[in-house]
Amino acid sequence: MAPTTTMGSALYPLGEMRRSQRADGLAAVLAIGTANPPNCVTQEEFPDFYFRVTNSDHLTALKDKFKRICQEMGVQRRYLHHTEEMLSAHPEFVDRDAPSLDARLDIAADAVPELAAEAAKKAIAEWGRPAADITHLVVTTNSGAHVPGVDFRLVPLLGLRPSVRRTMLHLNGCFAGCAALRLAKDLAENSRGARVLVVAAELTLMYFTGPDEGCFRTLLVQGLFGDGAAAVIVGADADDVERPLFEIVSAAQTIIPESDHALNMRFTERRLDGVLGRQVPGLIGDNVERCLLDMFGPLLGGDGGGGWNDLFWAVHPGSSTIMDQVDAALGLEPGKLAASRRVLSDYGNMSGATVIFALDELRRQRKEAAAAGEWPELGVMMAFGPGMTVDAMLLHATSHVN
């Protein structure tokens, strides 16, 4: 006999109540929007900019080394919220030892919601329904620590209902975009009629600092990361107005064993700091296939094998070296990571927002290629971050992508 509960004089079957509260179909990506600050710096000019604003032009050998690093990043340009004028007004930002976290957080408290809102407005416009129809809001950032936070600020900025159900995620690093979408899938599938707005926004101002002759990590971070925000609307059981792009078939997360030393972050009185170890690409290359098989093997029909090339790929472009490792480990054909490499080239690594940029670029490339021939219907969206954590989802591309 099915469990029941008594409400007043009526008897309600709990199983029927639960089914009525859940969506019938899979959660899907219904719209995507992205945004960047207006300040664009090319990779070619960045070493001169960086050493000038940090008063480090006298470190000629280190500057030459940094130029070589920038040339090997696979990055052509990046967008930055911080400008030369801002850094001149805040000399503590370029002093590696000066306490400056409060000033950075105060700037981020306004800049992050504004950038996030710009991306979200684009997603809502593409979606085609009123902002007031958003039922849930999931926001993720590494750039801030104010409460009320970015999620709260977005309610009036976007015209969301005061009753929108908000969730704020902090310090998930580069896997944050996938983690937020994974949460959105659960919300959409377990709440009939839910429409979840996911926003990831990042500012490199949180960890900008001057060069250190004894710290290669500083040069790597300053030459790789950029600023950006990405927004996605997720929902199940699309109505006649909505055009689902990617159904989220499955979502999973796992940890690479004995890797927590390789990549981590923490707030100090100076800035957001952490460890970005040289072993990160190798750890990903050695473990990515096993992680994917553990997460999606049964859904993909077993052991992967050459089947990895039968999928499309939206991989977080943490660096060109990381993508080279993924290519090699999975035996991917040339061009399989073209969307991710394009995003790295055009924007740099924007932490949690980057993988959503890659998904957006992938749908553009799919639209261009659809008329030319076959394109896989199934694909993987995947990101890596502190832990080390691998967060991924199996996607099904709908006809609306074309």
UniProtKB/Swiss-Prot annotation:
Stored InterPro entries: Chalcone/stilbene_synt_C (IPR012328), Chalcone/stilbene_synt_N (IPR001099), Polyketide_synthase_type-III (IPR011141), Thiolase-like (IPR016039)
Consequence the record notes for mutating residue 207 to F: Loss the bisdemethoxycurcumin-forming activity and formation of bisnoryangonin
Residue positions of the active site: 174
Known EC number: 2.3.1.211
Major enzyme class: transferase
Gene Ontology BP terms: flavonoid biosynthetic process; polyketide biosynthetic process
Segments crossing the lipid bilayer: none
Subunit: Homodimer.
Pathway named in the protein's UniProt entry: Secondary metabolite biosynthesis; flavonoid biosynthesis
Signal sequence annotation: none
Reactions the enzyme catalyzes: 2 4-coumaroyl-CoA + malonyl-CoA + H2O + H(+) = bisdemethoxycurcumin + 2 CO2 + 3 CoA
Single annotated GO MF: bisdemethoxycurcumin synthase activity
Lineage of origin: Eukaryota, Viridiplantae, Streptophyta, Embryophyta, Tracheophyta
Family classification: Belongs to the thiolase-like superfamily. Chalcone/stilbene synthases family.
Native organism: Oryza sativa subsp. japonica
Protein name per UniProt: Bisdemethoxycurcumin synthase
Job description of the protein: Plant-specific type III polyketide synthase (PKS) that catalyzes the one-pot formation of the C6-C7-C6 diarylheptanoid scaffold of bisdemethoxycurcumin by the condensation of two molecules of 4-coumaroyl-CoA and one molecule of malonyl-CoA.
Assigned keywords, A-Z: Acyltransferase, Flavonoid biosynthesis, Transferase
